[in-house]
Amino acid sequence: MQVFIMRHGDAVLDAASDSVRPLTPCGCDESRLMANWLKGQKVDIERVLVSPFLRAEQTLDVVGDCMNLPAQVDVLPELTPCGDVGLVSAYLQALANEEIGSVLVISHLPLVGYLVSELCPGETPPMFTTSAIANVTLDESGKGTFNWQMSPCNLKMAKAI
């Protein structure tokens, strides 16, 4: 199963609580850039898992405007910044056992980095800029292989060359 792990877009710092911080215009733009890039990779997302926090849900909305996503979206409290990475990993393994081919996960720091390490034992948690996406292949036994990571900055630099 292909797992695409995305950190939410850039969000405002000042809000009534962490859970209601909205995306900035830059966060929307960078999430759109990444979604269009992912679409260009011919990725077919079969399931979506998202944090209940506003900025993650807004990131999902932007991604959904750019590429075809399934109607079913699983909103998981385990995907909040201090969520349980073990539970998320177990959930992903259950999806793999259901023969789901690809999953998009939209979450937060530090969980996104820890999730890569949880799925790929021995892998150092990668740094995730806002809107960055990492790809992991999860095999039938539950062992993950870290394939790549892409960020808005990488795409902007490649375009400048």
Model-derived features: where do they sit?
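Short, surface-exposed amphipathic charged segments that create phosphate/polyanion-binding patches used
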Residues: 87-94
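Functional cleft and adjacent loop/helix regions within the main domain
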Residues: 74, 79-82, 92, 144-161
